[in-house]
Amino acid sequence: MSKVFKKTSSNGKLSIYLGKRDFVDHVDTVEPIDGVVLVDPEYLKCRKLFVMLTCAFRYGRDDLEVIGLTFRKDLYVQTLQVVPAESSSPQGPLTVLQERLLHKLGDNAYPFTLQMVTNLPCSVTLQPGPEDAGKPCGIDFEVKSFCAENPEETVSKRDYVRLVVRKVQFAPPEAGPGPSAQTIRRFLLSAQPLQLQAWMDREVHYHGEPISVNVSINNCTNKVIKKIKISVDQITDVVLYSLDKYTKTVFIQEFTETVAANSSFSQSFAVTPILAASCQKRGLALDGKLKHEDTNLASSTIIRPGMDKELLGILVSYKVRVNLMVSCGGILGDLTASDVGVELPLVLIHPKPSHEAASSEDIVIEEFTRKGEEESQKAVEAEGDEGS
């Protein structure tokens, strides 16, 4: 059974059908956006039917645009004339889903295929604060369809249909070795140093899974290690319009294991950074959020060698920090404790899903309709022809 996403314009004359809303960036290639647009022939008449793909970077509030300030920059716009079809842009082979939709929807349905370029950023949303209004900042993609004499013509909101999609990356097929780091700290009045080593078994980890952090301590000093603290930081670089950098802690936990003077310690700790623990943090980077759908922490940005980082708009990375609180003793006790730490790079991303071909010719349509200012959705099973 094939699932299809449908969105209809406010005037009811145009509908877009897409087989999915997440399109995978394989670093060197990007999945094409293939779908079908259904149009009322009386509404189309002698005009042209267009489908447009836009990648935009939004970095300000909607309400400020009313006073002439624009906080949106279109990074990429691709316009395809669907009706009448242009000979310079011939339609390639239809996908199985397009063939099924054309058979179901009738003669007023037209296929389209949009191809993203490889140097575009992935979908990222910066989480707004409780007082923020309007659309959140970030990178978003949308597919839009409208009827006009030319693509530059101004079209009213009720006369076009648009559907937000996401560009996502999955874990690379070949991951590198697990990162490791170590440090040596010497203390006054201690002949031998304190050695801390931390490592992870693999470089790439998936959203929601426990991350195993291995810690080895060789404490040859006369100091006592009172506790071990492990944290995960998300680093977001906004490189398109400024050099802003935001660091948000998405996981932190203190472990009460103590390491006595002149002793050794080795243990593996499980840490799991998830959005639920940081859901109120303003500016936290999330995977581009589609309305009505849960999201998660933004995936690490994977960059093709030689790629211009500035074109990506927002770069996301993670690091694991392991810190030891070393008691210096004396009458002040823990007030004079020293901090010894190391950092490990972390790649946090989604696993590559397994694609299973749909064996049934049935199509389930998930339709998005507008209710007031909110959008709601309903799943509708299409049994028979629709929209002609």
Swiss-Prot record:
Keywords: Cell projection, Disease variant, Disulfide bond, Sensory transduction, Vision. Homodimer; disulfide-linked in response to retinal illumination. Interacts with CXCR4; the interaction is dependent on the C-terminal phosphorylation of CXCR4 and modulates the calcium ion mobilization activity of CXCR4. Interacts with GPR84. Inner and outer segments, and the inner plexiform regions of the retina. The keyword Cell membrane does not apply. It is linked to Myopia 26, X-linked, female-limited: A form of myopia, a refractive error of the eye, in which parallel rays from a distant object come to focus in front of the retina, vision being better for near objects than for far. MYP26 is characterized by typical tigroid fundus changes commonly seen in early onset high myopia, and an unusual pattern of X-linked female-limited inheritance. It comes from Homo sapiens (Human). It is found in: Photoreceptor inner segment; Cell projection, Cilium, Photoreceptor outer segment. One of its GO terms (biological process) is G protein-coupled receptor internalization. SUPFAM superfamilies: E set domains. Pfam families: Arrestin_C, Arrestin_N. Changing A298D: In MYP26; uncertain significance. GO terms for cellular component: cytoplasm; photoreceptor inner segment; photoreceptor outer segment; synapse. May play a role in an as yet undefined retina-specific signal transduction. Could bind to photoactivated-phosphorylated red/green opsins. Changing L80P: In MYP26; uncertain significance. Its main location: other. Belongs to the arrestin family. The lineage of its organism: Eukaryota, Metazoa, Chordata, Craniata, Vertebrata. This is Arrestin-C. One of its GO terms (molecular function) is G protein-coupled receptor binding. The gene is ARR3.
